[in-house]
Amino acid sequence: MTRRGGSDAAWYSAPDQRSAYPRYRGMRYSSCYVTMRDGVRIAIDLYLPAGLTSAARLPAILHQTRYYRSLQLRWPLRMLLGGKPLQHIAADKRRRRRFVASGYAWVDVDVRGSGASFGARVCEWSSDEIRDGAEIVDWIVRQPWCNGTVAALGNSYDGTSAELLLVNQHPAVRVIAPCFSLFDVYTDIAFPGGIHAAWFTDTWGRYNEALDRNALHEVVGWWAKLPVTGMQPVQEDRDRSLRDGAIAAHRGNYDVHQIAGSLTFRDDVSASDPYRGQPDARLEPIGTPIESGSINLISPHNYWRDVQASGAAIYSYSGWFDGGYAHAAIKRFLTVSTPGSHLILGPWNHTGGWRVDPLRGLSRPDFDHDGELLRFIDHHVKGADTGIGSEPPVHYFTMVENRWKSADTWPPPATTQSYYLSADRQLRPDAPDCDSGADEYVVDQTAGTGERSRWRSQVGIGGHVCYPDRKAQDAKLLTYTSAPLDHPLEVTGHVVVTLFITSTSSDGTFFVYLEDVDPRGRVAYITEGQLRAIHRRLSDGPPPYRQVVPYRTFASGDAWPLVPGEIARLTFDLLPTSYLFQPGHRIRIAIAGADASHFAILPGCAPTVRVYRSRMHASRIDLPVIQP
């Protein structure tokens, strides 16, 4: 399955698009409002194949977005598109065109409280927003062109909307593809390792607030005001008065960064939690949530039993540099075991627009994302023989080896190979035999992973991910490096680190980076993990969803502050990866006490940390190694 030139092209020779439906050329556009049960009007764009006969019946793709379903060009520019809207997200535009040409209707939706839709947003993915999805499906299946079958998909927020649509258990929805999207809001994006991802909640919150005011130029640049008026009004709204009314309704939208900043633990309840507000403003819960706490009530993991009961097949789709979402895709795949579900993990950034190679940098992917989604959805919706039904359910890409591999589950069978922190900043395969040994590190609170990291990729519709030579940053960190390898070493799965530490503080943030040092001394980033020390307690209790890494609750009742000077054990996982270390290269772990580029710095002065490496307190990293 290796491709020449290091390509990430698919494991099959070419997309097999055999379909029970004919192919079409061109699209027919219309838009309208659909009124929900509470009177809120939701804006919808509909795309049908051009030349569709009145007798034809098609399945539909439902795509619900928080980032505008489309834009309106100013006069006379809009005449260049024949009055049709401007499709501002290139990946969605290509996907829409591909699916419509393949015999699907495509429905774009501005979710409640966003775009040209009315209503206010009291939280993301509210129970009202989820219920809207079922009513929109009802509207779709009533249309004369619909055959009664609906699939849902999307990247990022839109992918989560597709997943939560299944909470309704609507019989028309047979398959979804949540791509590059979260599963557990707390650990996947808002608080990885229990540390507030402050850059994300602040930046994403400000961008959304600007979009909700129809101020696109504040997100993409001042020039955006020149060609567009903003979000696309529906066709009946010729004077844009309805759009203006929707924008006015958005003034009541909530502030995600403010709420996130008020939380520490998974079970914290925000003062502005919409599920516990005044009776006349309180949201009615939906589904059968398994955990309490403000952040859990907007998280897909909390409703996995409802999603499972839908019976819909799910394609969990992500990339190794997609923020924390590769692990999200894994957790979803392992937890929601509906028949026909698949998992794919490629060498991509958020939304898959770039292929990331730790040794060679960025390139455009050869992988046909839209063709792969068509293979999956055609199989489940049209019963087409696309080949996917006979394949193993898991495919993953091993970087450096540049090879797609398959498995029946995740992680693939591996042997744990431990490397121990040792004297002289060495990383050794043999456990220490000394009675004492430690290294002292004064936390450098300026340390960070830069402006083109995996965490920045989550904002800006899939930004570039490129980690430059880490040598300069590593000078700020505590590093341990192995001897040069004498053979290739494939690491696939979840790396786990165990640190024995003392600190001058009662809390702290710990970041561990797995790196590759080449023979010239260049340092390449592979993956990372983090943990806030107050969350260090491991739990033997049943987790809320299936786990294959050390489990902790992140609940307030399990808080465990450090005692200055007392040795504490920190065990946590790094984000999953599949990477081949080459002969002559060295393995490095780098330990930091801050990532100022992305995560909140705890109040107080920079602590001094001691990392122990003795017989009794053997700090180590456990690598899941695939034997050749």
UniProtKB/Swiss-Prot annotation:
One of its GO terms (cellular component) is plasma membrane. SUPFAM superfamilies: alpha/beta-Hydrolases, Galactose-binding domain-like. The active site is at S156 (acyl-ester intermediate), D322 (charge relay system), H350 (charge relay system). Keywords: Hydrolase, Serine esterase. Pfam families: Peptidase_S15, PepX_C. SMART domains: PepX_C. It is an enzyme of class 3 (hydrolase). Its EC number is 3.1.1.-. InterPro entries: AB_hydrolase_fold, CocE/Ser_esterase, Galactose-bd-like_sf, Xaa-Pro-like_dom, Xaa-Pro_dipept_C, Xaa-Pro_dipeptidyl-ppase/CocE. One of its GO terms (molecular function) is carboxylic ester hydrolase activity. It comes from the Bacteria. NCBIfam families: CocE_NonD. Belongs to the CocE/NonD hydrolase family. This is Putative serine esterase Rv1835c. It comes from Mycobacterium tuberculosis (strain ATCC 25618 / H37Rv).
